[in-house]
Swiss-Prot record:
Gene Ontology biological process terms in this record: fatty acid biosynthetic process
Subcellular location: Cytoplasm
Function: Transfers the 4'-phosphopantetheine moiety from coenzyme A to a Ser of acyl-carrier-protein.
Gene from which this protein is expressed: acpS
Protein name per the record: Holo-[acyl-carrier-protein] synthase
Organism whose genome encodes this protein: Clavibacter sepedonicus
GO molecular function terms noted in the UniProt entry: holo-[acyl-carrier-protein] synthase activity; magnesium ion binding
């Protein structure tokens, strides 16, 4: 059963300017393994994290570090979650998180669907 849906779009150039103006932004938003990725990939991961927050109902008090976008052996993206994000997901009955990301024409987009059992 679908528990939540979230989508987000990020302007890659605007994200790059923000990261350049604010040196602490990338370390605050991303796990160590994510930080060395190209700007377009970071923008897509930021969109993914925003989309996950929306799919979970906009929980406050989370740490960006509680969400990491990882890729499996086939290159498909997914989330590793911990801390407050994992607690909110469990409290809302979320047992699976689906993620799709893309970047093209200066925009990064992410779409998240959360699933769980029951009503």
């Amino acid at each position: 059963m679908i528990r939540g849906i979230g989508v987000d779009v990020v302007d890659v150039a605007r994200f790059a300017r923000s990261a350049e103006r604010t040196p602490g932004l990338v370390p605050r938003l991303f796990a160590p393994a994510e930080r060395s990725l190209p700007t377009r990939s970071l923008a897509a991961r930021f969109a993914a994290k925003e989309a996950l927050i929306k799919a979970l109902g906009g929980p406050g008090g989370i740490s960006w570090q509680d969400m990491e976008v990882v890729r499996d052996a086939h290159g498909d993206p997914s989330f590793q979650v911990g801390g407050a994000v994992a607690r909110v997901a469990a409290a809302r009955g979320v047992t699976r998180i689906h993620l799709s990301m893309s970047h093209d024409a200066g925009l990064a987009t992410a779409f998240v669907v959360t699933e769980g059992e029951g009503a």
